[in-house]
Swiss-Prot record:
Keywords for the protein's UniProt record, in alphabetical order: ATP-binding, Ligase, Nucleotide-binding, Protein biosynthesis
Primary enzyme class: ligase
Gene Ontology MF terms: ATP binding; glutaminyl-tRNA synthase (glutamine-hydrolyzing) activity
Protein's recorded name: Glutamyl-tRNA(Gln) amidotransferase subunit A
Organism: Sphingopyxis alaskensis (strain DSM 13593 / LMG 18877 / RB2256) (Sphingomonas alaskensis)
Family, per entry: Belongs to the amidase family. GatA subfamily.
Gene3D superfamilies: Amidase signature (AS) domain
Active site per database record: 78 (charge relay system), 159 (charge relay system), 183 (acyl-ester intermediate)
Amino acid sequence: MTELTNLTVAQIRDGHRAGDFSAVEVAEAFNANVAAAKALNAFIVETPDLAIEAAKAADADRAAGTLKPLSGVPIGMKDLFCTNGVQTTAASHMLEGFVPRYESTVSQKLWDAGAGMLGKLNLDQFAMGSSNETSYFGNVISPWRRNDGGNAALAPGGSSGGSSAAIAARLCPAATGTDTGGSIRQPAAFTGISGIKPTYGRCSRWGIVAFASSLDQAGPMARTVRDCAIMLENMAGFDPKDATSLDLPVPNWEAALSSDLRGKTVGIPREYRLEGIDPDIDAMWDAGIAMLKDAEAAVVEISLPHTKYALPAYYIIAPAEASSNLARYDGVRYGLRDLPQGAGLQDMYAATRAEGFGAEVKRRIMIGTYVLSAGFYDAYYTQAQKVRTLIARDFEAAFGSCDVILAPTAPSAAFGLGEKMADPLAMYLNDVFAVPASLAGLPAMSVPAALNREGLPLGLQIIGKPFDEQGVLNAGLAIEERAGFTARAEKWW
């Protein structure tokens, strides 16, 4: 029998249902992998007891004939989702020791569906970063290594780097992520797994620590497209507690999965053909186009003329919203409090925020405060919002002639830890292909498609029309079946 930790979500669900193994056996196997993988630093909090508790309930449900959609499936929870009675930190010193007395909507939906929690996964602090190097609890280290014989530590991507590393290393079969400007898709591409950011509003933001409210969107990460569909079905749905939640029924994405793209048209954006891009990325993209043609899709070139303005607009809008959202961390009600001897209220605010926030978070708060200030609001923030509208219109026009768009997920494979930390702009450029879909609120998915010449995974991105997660998943499945990506990191941890 295949080792239990090598099974996908679908295989665990179906195998447990058929009585091939117990949920407790599965939970114990993953708990053991988590305990043995401290070197990856993927988890901030481990919750083996909760995983076993849910597994026992799943086994009881099987005996009683009352199985749920995710009975027997243990998962990882990004530590941005509030979990009742379990520390939730957003990987920041500011929230170290914060234990919520309530459950986020998305995590509650997953527990209601029968899933169990293996632990809270590491991330970039307040989800701000592309390498998982901004976490107060230390870097997550990718399970992947270059094939050059060296052992340089690589970034797992960010901000959902704990999620991507844990799935790639078989510490969990699936995990939650959040995506503000690529934080599900880019780490998925870096570690050879799949991840989907659904249409903005598909998954409730209630109980997720906020970064940029008009962009933040929860989504699943897993090893296969089918697993992402299964997870997303159990995460999505209308929530009256979230003002931006979509009041739409949740489709049965898994049942409708099909890699036959007959009658579908795939758009290839000419503006994404960047000068000087890594030739391995270009080759993978061309191979992806051939795969979709093989799936009977028509392929057309499209134009997204305002693409070059997406990154600058994003790095105005997201920090502006972050500076507003993070104003709540003042040391008064919860989280860290730094009260110097004889200090007044203003001193406490300053000391608490100086101590609690990391350098990248402070950088974004300062950028955000600057672009929202009276003298610069119109010059920066208002203009960025206009650009955002133009980008959304570009996509709308492009979707007049195609059903989905194919592009690379990231401009490179995983880079070494520390390689880009000295230059924030080089780090921000990593989001160049991911940010446009976020600004337009579109569903977008990364699927592993190839290894580069260094033996590292590369991901292809599929962007869909609003609410058409099915189209995105189907194109992803077509790539998955044809790419035949089965590579996994050699165990060194």
